[in-house]
Design a protein with these regions (language model features):
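Extracytosolic/lumenal membrane-interface segments
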Residues: 1-199
Length: 199
């Protein structure tokens, strides 16, 4: 079996850029979310939209911790320079981060829908938002389920020597459906502004 040589750009890492961006963006999210919740609690106006965004923020902080473990394990470096154990650890922590990602996106989108519903509950708008929330739950749950069942045992996701996994194309198709739902909801939220809907 032919062994691939070292990558032309050498033993470099993009992990540092990744973890810095993740930390900065999570910090901004934490500050703005804390300010929002502080105002809502002070004015005794907290609602379900606040609860869902708070849960998303908590999971985001936990996800950042696991992203740090990813970085420590060598994520962002060429696999050529990683030992087998280190490479497996990088994939393992990536798996944990992925399981949180879909939940965080789902909770954030639901929070936006619930926030709009607090402002205006026009008949057509209400049903569109309920449909978006249902679609978001379904398309977020699907990749989560596949992440847990595509490899048996689950550990074989990062250690392919101990089990079997489904074809990756199945997971990819579901993830594309998820991002299709995210894009659809984003277009709708932007459309509300562009069409100057009186909220």
């Amino acid at each position: 079996m032919e062994t691939l040589g070292p990558p032309p750009d050498g033993n470099v890492t993009k992990g540092t850029t990744f973890i810095i961006l993740a930390t900065v963006l999570t910090s901004i999210s934490l500050i703005t979310t804390a300010m929002r919740l502080g105002v809502r609690i002070t004015n005794r106006q907290q609602g379900w939209d606040d609860l869902t965004i708070a849960l998303a923020m908590i999971l985001g902080l936990v996800q950042l911790v696991f992203s740090g473990l990813q970085y420590h394990a060598g994520i962002g470096r060429h696999a050529y320079y990683l030992g087998q154990t280190q490479a497996m650890d990088a994939v393992k922590w990536s798996y944990v981060v992925m399981t949180m990602f879909f939940v965080i996106v789902c909770l954030t989108k639901i929070s936006i829908c619930l926030f709009i519903l607090r402002i205006k509950k026009t008949g057509w708008l209400k049903w569109v938002l309920y449909t978006l929330m249902a679609g978001q739950v379904i398309t977020s749950a699907a990749p989560e389920i596949i992440l847990f069942v595509q490899c048996r045992p689950v550990r074989s996701f990062w250690d392919r020597s101990i089990g079997q996994c489904w074809d990756q194309s199945i997971y990819n198709a579901v993830v594309w459906a998820h991002f299709g739902m995210v894009t659809t909801s984003n277009c709708f939220y932007n459309g509300l502004t562009l069409c100057k809907v009186m909220l």
